Amino acid sequence: MKLDAKSTIEAGKAILGIELGSTRIKAVLIDQENKPIVQGSHTWENQLVDGLWTYSVEAVWYGLQDCYADLRTNVKSLYDTEIETLAAIGVSAMMHGYMAFNEKEEILVPFRTWRNTNTSQAAAALSELFVSNIPLRWSISHLYQAILDNEEHVPSINYLTTLAGFVHWQITGQKVLGIGDASGMLPIDPITKNYSSEMVDKFDKLIAPKGYDWKLRDILPKVLSAGENAGFLTPEGASRLDVSGHLKAGIPVCPPEGDAGTGMVATNAVKQRTGNVSAGTSSFSMIVLEKELSKPYEMIDMVTTPDGSLVAMVHCNNCTSDLNAWINIFKEYQELMGIPVDMDEIYGKLYNHALTGNADCGGLISYNYISGEPITGLAAGRPLFVRSANDKFNLANFMRTHLYASVGVLKIGNDILFNEEKIRVDRITGHGGLFKTKGVGQRILAAAINSPISVMETAGEGGAWGIALLASYLANNGNDQSLADFLDKHVFTGNAGIEISPTAEDVSGFNTYIESYKAGLPIEEAAVRFKN
């Protein structure tokens, strides 16, 4: 029998997902049909302390408590009831970074987030040692950099985890981590669905001369796949989340996951030959692979889905920020002319007008580098618009080049997967700000990666919904379905979203554009060198 939202909450059948993102902590309650029924949130910011980006442990708990309190308030105002118990809980957070604890469970140095780039020496050395691409932001890079820097705390490490792993440990007592989040600490062996034992052994041998009391295996969280038992909410955990004291202990908690994994779940992209692209301030693509790549590539990170399939991730620092800055110039023009401003209309008109331009943007090129872009080898960036005197300079081409630029670096990374590795995909789902204007961002991305792109209404629900779905998979998967089948049958039920396929003309035009773009990169390098 289907219960209404109020009865679902009162019967303890609702499921809670909480995600700690870089600017917001979001909580969502879902019903027995896996649909969101109420949300809560808390806004927070990272701090730069001693040259490193961090959030304090106090800020983590204050943020979680405030987010949960906001959820409680919304439950009260919408349904006039109280959350006493739940069918399951899931916690997810931004991946990677460094949270190291001693045996008294005290944090040894402030949490170092994924944003820190002080690990280049360690990442380069480990990439060579492991014969695998080890990004700067991965936990193992942070650990080895601390060792290289002879940091005092290293001998005292008893446990090393991610933000999601930390919160889960504190509310359940379990030192575990979902496989997707674990794959951002250290590479995963797709066969054993555990940390690569070869790499763990190599690391221990590398640091053996230091004589630490610990081995790498001893300090890492146990790896779990989606649906596995990851512990229960303890009385201390319940009071840490809900300071009002209403929430009861004993609720099952699913394996904690990273934001990449919850994004895959929220877009129904955990099956092999599917993928998703997140395109907002920054962008990334995640393609679920059928087999390992033939060799490591510096611009492709290897992670996994929450159930352990290999994923090739291309991450770009820049996406829509420069595009938005140009849109604001047109907004200023309208205000100057005394024309009423409707931002949705400005975006809609300019984006759609871009589609009337030349497929190769008439020769115009844009570099949208607000910050550096590792894939194209730039440590810093300067937004740059470049044209020759005889290019076709008009508004449609001007807007089109800025739309192309928003996914240009993403194309360069994905061209390796599709052209060199011959990866095949059946469906890619897009989500994020670039797709807000119907059909335009989709068509541009379809041309960039020569693949049909779907957009779903629910994609905007994001990671908190994704981790709630993983908690639902733990609680409601009575007949042992795979995660992909569970999502297909019980969540998305045939909703593949609205799909746009690339046209031959757009694909050919984008390919011409990207060759000019790559040839012109020294212009961007010069801008970085000479423009303060």
Locate predicted features.
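N-terminal glycine/serine-rich phosphate-binding loop of ATP-dependent small-molecule kinases
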Residues: M1-P110, A124-A125, S156, R217, ...
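Conserved phosphate-binding/catalytic loop of the ribokinase/pfkB sugar-kinase fold
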Residues: T113
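Glycine-rich phosphate-binding loop of ATP-grasp-fold ATP-dependent ligases
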Residues: V109, D181-I188
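Active-site core segments that coordinate phosphate-bearing ligands/cofactors
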Residues: K2-E10, L16-G17, I83, Q121-L177, ...
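Conserved alpha/beta enzyme-core scaffolds, especially Rossmann-like or related mixed alpha/beta domains
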Residues: G178-D181, D213-S225
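Carbohydrate-associated surface elements
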Residues: N116
